Amino acid sequence: MKKKTFLCLILTAAIFLSAFSTFRNEQGMDGANVVSSVTPEDTADCGAIWANKFSTKGFSCNSIPIMGANGIYIVNSNTLYELSYANGQVLRKTTLKEKMDSVCNMLLEEHFLYIPLANGTMECVDINSMTSLWQSESFGGQSLSTTFYHNGYLYAGTTNVLSNGTTTGLFYCLNAKDGSTVWTYEDKDHPGGYYWSGAIVYEDALYFTGDNGILVSHSLTESVVYDTAVLTTANIRAGLTYHKETDALYTVAKDGTLFQIQCGNQKITKVSSGKIMNGANFVTCTSTPTIYNNRLYVGCMADQYGYVCIMDALTLKPIYQVKGFQNAEVKSSPLVSTRGSSTGEVTVYFSMNALPGGLYAFKDTEGNLL
């Protein structure tokens, strides 16, 4: 049986100006997942420009797309494709040493594409020549976390899903030049994998969290833990992001608790929290927040409906929610576009984890309460 997996280009070419080099273009600075490109404003401006399909045996998924100078890079199964911006045709391709898991959060730094793959491995491909330069050792498990790059080092985590639904895993650091292991971290007393979560650098420490709900402050280049903090007993399957005005990190637990985390001198100094949906009987959230103009946007499912929640990033209190469809969780990290405007109005884009699939948008402005 062959499964055909499709990649559709939905937005106009203007969104390519964003040129994201990794998931959310997260680089540990203010404004992650916020763009100024003149993106489409309404349904009439949207639609598929082209679609491509990859024919594979059995089940396969597409990685996140990476925008390069010469094309779009995407992995399906164990093949890396370079696609034309104009029509989606395959320009070049190369076979990887492992297949990707259900998620593959690649990262492009200069002309080096770092690709997390099955069995807890990372492979580096030079996209100028489309040749593999190195493959890391195997850490085991699935590569489901985001990938973070900082000053010549790569950071990512692994996940092993056990029969009872719990997870184990480790976090690791690689030398980006040759793929050699610099350090690994595993909390065997409080096991938990790194399932869609990831790391961020603040000042001179690496911060990451995962399914055990524990935030870790770790040395960038040595096997040294500076500090830990138990944020929650729930899983954390969202990434961390930074907000300049509060000088704080933010993440969300699976139970819908939003955390604001202040750090200094490699220590976790203060943790504040708030609920993204008050009054709901059941909430699940794996969406990484996006922050703009002190408003925080995060997706979830609450009482069987998908939502995007708009929160006050200063007080951690809900402002309002945008309701989606039944049984259609908003797992995506909302993309906020200013469209080059200085009025404060933004367009917020998101997708829902349900068929038939698609892209949705709404407008928001400072002071908007509904």
Where are these regions (language model features)?
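Extracytoplasmic/lumenal domain signature
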Residues: 22-62, 66-103, 107-144, 148-370
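Hydrophobic core
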Residues: 11, 15-18
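Positively charged n-region of N-terminal signal peptides that target proteins for export
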Residues: 1-5
